[in-house]
Design a protein with these regions (language model features):
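C-terminal His-loop and adjacent cap/lid subdomain of alpha/beta-hydrolase
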Residues: 1-225
Length: 225
């Protein structure tokens, strides 16, 4: 059960990094791009978060500005820090920055603490954890600052009986019921990505094996108990 991991004493981050495999998406997109250039395929449909439908918002120091879940209370720190971008005068070299700032939006999260929109690989479509695109440094490593481009995650409770009362996210048991239910949802996610041309058929084999690997871990054997 990969999401139930501890952080080593020498680790910089306060939380474990996100285990969210996405390399197959790049191969599928490059394959489509190559075919489009050759005139044998059309571009894939766009899929990105939008302000209009609430899947993007302007973040603040309040973690609930992006999510209804109070992740810091559950153990996943949040600083509200994100990259900013100034309006620059590009008519000269070097360019001259101004004090005007672009509005930066971030994806909003669903009831499980994951991005509502965008292309979802199996780890995101059939999640075992809340995945964050940031990572906060722990004590001894400039505590509270962002840890570069690192990610983080906070696992769901495996069984409902073991849930933290403050955790509003569904447990793995509530989401999938049994190991077979999890694998069925996982494989359906893989098949949909292949049908949408967001995963190559060759990669689908490896990703279905990844689902088996997840479900074969020791703690997963207690799912539904």
């Amino acid at each position: 059960y990969t999401v139930d991991r501890t952080v080593s004493a020498t680790a910089v981050s306060a939380s474990p990094g996100a285990l969210n495999a996405s390399t197959a998406l790049f191969r599928a997109l490059m394959s489509n791009l190559d075919a489009w250039v050759k005139g044998t395929a059309t571009p894939l449909a766009s899929n990105w978060p939008k302000v209009a439908d609430g899947t993007m918002s302007v973040p603040t120091t309040d973690p609930k500005s992006l999510s209804a879940i109070d992740l810091p209370t559950l153990g996943l720190a949040y600083s509200g820090v994100y990259n900013t971008l100034t309006v620059n005068d590009e008519s000269v070299i070097p360019s001259i920055p101004s004090n005007k700032m672009y509005v930066v939006h971030q994806p909003t999260q669903d009831a499980q603490g994951n991005s509502k929109s965008g292309v979802k690989m199996p780890d995101s479509a059939v999640p075992l954890a809340s995945f964050m695109s940031y990572s906060i440094r722990k004590s001894g490593f400039v505590a509270g600052d962002q840890n570069g481009l690192s990610s983080s995650q906070l696992g769901f409770a495996l069984n409902t009986s073991a849930k933290n009362k403050a955790d509003t996210r569904k447990s793995v048991q509530e989401l999938y019921g049994t190991k077979a239910g999890y694998l069925s949802a996982w494989n359906a996610s893989v098949d949909k990505l292949v049908a949408d041309k967001l995963m190559l058929a060759d990669d689908a084999i490896d990703y279905k094996n990844r689902g088996l690997m997840q479900s074969a871990q020791p703690n997963f054997s207690t799912l539904g108990q």
